[in-house]
Amino acid sequence: MISSHEVSAPSGSAQWRSIDWKAVERHVLRLQMRIAKAIREGKHGKAKALQWILTHSKAAKLLAVRRVSQNKGSKTPGIDGDIWNTDARRMAAVSLLSRKGYRAKPLRRIYIPKKNGKLRPLGIPCMIDRAQQALHLLALEPISETIADPNSYGFRPNRSAADAIQQCFKCLCKKGAAQWVLEGDIKACFDKIGHQWLLDNIPTDKRMLKQWLECGYIDKGLFYKTAEGTPQGGIISPTLMLLTLVGLEKLTKSIARKTGSRVNFIGYADDFVITGSSKEVLVNDIKPQLMAFLQERGLTLSEEKTHVTHINDGFDFLGFNARKYKGKLLIKPSKSNVLSFLRNMRDLIRKHATIPVADLIKMINPKLRGWANYYRHCVAKQTFGYVGHQMFLALWRWSVRRHPNKGRKWIAHKYFLNLQGQWTFHGWFKKAGKYGVIRLFDIAKVPIKRHVKIMSQANPFDPFWEGFLNERKVKNTGRNSWFDPVATAL
């Protein structure tokens, strides 16, 4: 017989690997649905009590640790240099998620380039702070999804830029549709949201929220306080911004009822468009009310990026251009986005002048495929053909520069396959002792499929929408499963 002291407790790694994640997710989802139901019924006290139960449950703590330790940023440390890269560390971290004695550490400030050449500051929290934010986000998201504007599509589950663009099409495509568009952009939205407004209005643990808002950041060894804004890089920040802007659509609709105008709101994060039947309504009625709404929250409209445009002149939104041509609405990839993408691809090719062809193709293909997937729901066939041709020219120049003493015919046969009369850039690779050929992704062959927009009122925390969202997920998975083979073993 084995005595009790001879039986060792399972290690942290073994405990983590033995977790039934489906059961954990079901437990958390049940609580989230109860929170959403309480909000729909106006029982805010009950919702607050359920939030407390959720944030103190082991299931929610497990999910929070898994999210921050296994996502894309999990290998990027905060100021303490700590990362949870083993199962044992993840299991140990679960017990650290306590409200008692918690104090958020300053963020590690880094800078990433923006499209306009400027630098965007990002604040990287420590792992424990990320996990605490992820934990409280589990309790906050059911509320944000229940009260969010129906036609707001950024930073929300089951929603995408494609949904926002399809809503633009729906609002503008008909003959009698509104002809004027207010393109709105909120200036430095994440950096300027007022702390007091957040503390007074966000339905979450105020003490924890205050910690995250006022933790400050360290930049080049110096500590700086934060008097406004939410940290770009914090897991909970997008939802805080979403809740800050809740009510924009309701505001525009109330103005429309008073003026008798046709007005529609489409939002995505801090970008939005408002369609109106006249320029006067947008400029004189809508815009002043928007500015007052934002000012209350410490925000302002960007004068550079906020315009009122006629639909016949077109407007850019989320990298797309929407414009009517002889009364017909066409939504295409924006010219600036196409040129920017090609510039980046040419730079990538130019910087890797000496690497093996197969390695270059492996770098290019995911970028081409991702860009095509983003735009394949709009009128993009001609654009895809143009991008494909420009890629051919860039890779031809790359091939010629590698062999200045060789003839064009020799270069063509070395780097390009003739497939049914079409020259395709290709390379060779060796894997497990076998040779194979890898081809450039043919963006011109990407099929155009109209995106089916999510229903505006759909809520993943309402059982009523469960069947609809599951069916939509299956359909979208099927739509995304088209495949153009690019690697073949011989």
Question: Across the structure, where does each feature detected by a protein language model lie?
Answer:
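A conserved non-catalytic segment of reverse transcriptases
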Residues: 297-363, 367-371
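Short, charge-rich, low-complexity alpha-helical interaction segments
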Residues: 1-9
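Conserved polymerase palm-domain catalytic core
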Residues: 96, 115, 147-151, 156, ...
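Right-hand nucleic-acid polymerase module
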Residues: 348-409
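Charged boundary/loop elements
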Residues: 14-73, 138-154
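Hydrophobic alpha-helical hairpins/lids featuring a short glycine-rich hinge
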Residues: 113-116, 122-146
